[in-house]
Structures are given as C-alpha cells and as structure tokens.
From Swiss-Prot:
Principal location listed in the UniProt entry: cytoplasm
Keyword Zinc-finger set for record: no
GO CC annotation terms, alphabetical: cytoplasm
Organism: Methanothermococcus thermolithotrophicus
SUPFAM superfamilies: P-loop containing nucleoside triphosphate hydrolases
Name this polypeptide is given: Adenylate kinase
Keywords: ATP-binding, Cytoplasm, Kinase, Nucleotide-binding, Transferase
Length: 192
C-alpha cells in the first residue's frame, strides 16, 4: 500500500501545528509513524543547498522565478520522502499579503506533492484573535475577526481547488478552545 501524503493547513494561530504534533505522538505509540515536515523549512533547505540564502529571511528576497523553482524542488523532495514513510506537510493553504491572497500550494507544487488528503484546521475568528494576542513568542500582524474569517473562507476555497486538481479529499477540523483533544482525535482518525 502506498504511503499517504497529508497536507495540514490553517491560518496563523489556529493551532494546526500543535494538533499535528500531538496526533503524531499518539500515532507513534500505535506504531504508525508519519514524518512531519514544514514546507517552508524544506524550501529553505533546498535554497541553502544551492547556496542561494544563508538565513530564512533572505527567502522572500529571491526573485519570483527562483522562488518558483525552489518551491517545485521542495515539493519533489517531500514527494521522495513519501517513498520511505507517510508524510504530513505543515503549510498554509493561502498566505495573506498586502496585494491579496497568495496560494500556499500553487499548481507546480501540487503536481510534485500529489497529496492524498488536505486538512483545513479552523475555529472562530474571535478565538484566533485572542490566541494571537496572547502569543508573545510571535510577532504577528494585528487583524480583525472579520479579516481572519475572510482568510479562513479563502483557505477553504483554495483547499477545495487543490482537491479538484489532485483528487485529494478535503477535511475540515474544528480546533475550539478547551477542545484540543477532540481536534487531535479527529486528525488521528483521518491519518490512520
């Protein structure tokens, strides 16, 4: 049986990384071992291997054609990992920029990854705003709940588009305050 490639997405502050890490720990206890990778980290590693950057901040300064090439190579590198074990890719469905929403998984990346499942982690805009305000470890842009909810709508639309292009299923998981265990269990049931 082919190893799964699962993409987990969500707006900053929704808790996608936390849910995924906890699910990985529990699955590991059952002998189910996914490799978890962050798409941006793999891109950075590829750019470093090519001596294009020394630190992660230099990534966004690369010209667009180079960035596309690095994205494609990162997708290919992750697809190679799936030959060895199932993989969960932690990334963003869309990235909110001053000029609009940028697809987190453009078609040249999707063609390389060919995911089996796309997970969209969500909760209310109010909950995300409060989490962001309480997170002193990150320097996030201040955003209204309406802006956060718009971003989540765009994530859903993008995720369904990714599903249409690849045949991947799309699963939405709610990560409500004080109900983390439910979200973790829901992710585990998808990953089994």
């Amino acid at each position: 049986m082919k190893n799964k490639l699962v993409v987990v997405t969500g707006v900053p502050g929704v808790g996608g990384t936390t849910i995924t890490q906890k699910a990985m720990e529990k699955l590991s206890e059952e002998g189910i071992n996914y490799k978890m990778v962050n798409f941006g980290t793999v891109m950075f590693e590829v750019a470093q291997e090519e001596n294009l950057v020394e630190d992660r901040d230099q990534m966004r300064k690369l010209d667009p054609d180079t960035q596309k090439r690095i994205q494609k190579l990162a997708g290919r590198k992750i697809a190679e990992m799936v030959k060895e074990s199932p993989v969960v890719v932690d990334t963003h469905s869309t990235i909110k920029t001053p000029k609009g929403y940028l697809p987190g998984l453009p078609v040249w990346v999707l063609n390389e990854l060919n995911p089996d499942i796309i997970i969209v982690v969500e909760t209310s805009g109010d909950e995300i705003l409060i989490r962001r305000l309480n997170d002193e470890t990150r320097n996030r842009d201040l955003e209204t709940t309406a802006g956060i909810e718009e971003h989540q709508i765009m994530n859903r639309a993008a995720a369904m588009t990714y599903g249409v292009l690849t045949g991947a299923t799309v699963k939405i998981i709610q990560n409500k305050n004080n109900l983390l265990d439910y979200a973790v269990e829901e992710l585990i049931s998808v990953l089994r």
